[in-house]
Amino acid sequence: MKSALHESRADTAEATSSASSAWKSVRALPARTLIFFIELYRTYVSPLRMPTCRFMPTCSEYAVESLRTHGVIKGLFLTVVRLAKCAPWHPGGWDPVPARRDRHAGGRRCCPANVDEQRST
């Protein structure tokens, strides 16, 4: 009896994992589509032009990395901000994609680790 119950739970966990994986693929589709067009630009248009990007990584590398790291909404926003910097008045230089923050890392904690310390201050 235990074996059948264990198998049932394993099947449910596998189905949930499969559904979660499928949902992640669907959510990544818009970013992948934009990355596809950026790769087309890098393959066919960029070689015809002189290298002019004043940043490291280049704007197209930055766009691909920001889309992969942050998804389509924030990645596209970061890319537009980066392209807006690409002007003669900006010095350029090293401008990496910001790291992805954990949703709960920057927020307030509901239960402080040491309540006594906070009460004494």
From Swiss-Prot:
It is found in: Cell membrane. It is a peripheral membrane protein. Pfam families: YidD (PF01809). GO terms for cellular component: plasma membrane. Transmembrane segments: none annotated. It comes from the Bacteria. Residues 97-121 are annotated as: Disordered. Keywords: Cell membrane, Membrane. The keyword Repeat does not apply. NCBIfam families: membrane protein insertion efficiency factor YidD (TIGR00278). Belongs to the UPF0161 family. Could be involved in insertion of integral membrane proteins into the membrane. This is Putative membrane protein insertion efficiency factor. It comes from Rhodococcus jostii (strain RHA1). The lineage of its organism: Bacteria, Bacillati, Actinomycetota, Actinomycetes, Mycobacteriales.
